[in-house]
Amino acid sequence: PSATLTNIARGGVVDDAALAAALRERRIAAAGLDVFEGEPKVHPDLLTVPNVVLTPHIASATVATRRAMASLAADNLIAALTGATVPNPLNPQVLPLRASRG
């Protein structure tokens, strides 16, 4: 096999037990994960396969990233409170509801 699976998205996107089986049976060459189905716990089967790299999900734990996150949140909040267009909504489907209420 030549496939390598990488999951840095969210736990639950990948079935950890099925992935461990695929790695053990060499249907997948390797995997790299920093999120897990049952976070914060790692599926025990993943701990037994040598062709997986498991790391903590801490990519956003830098001063620069946390400042950017705070700025983004503040920009969204100010826009929402002043009636301006929210620049980065997580649920844009609700914006027309807000507009229709005046």
Each model region followed by its residue ranges:
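Short glycine-dipeptide loop
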Residues: 1-3
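Rossmann-like dinucleotide-binding domain for NAD(H)/NADP(H)
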Residues: 5-102
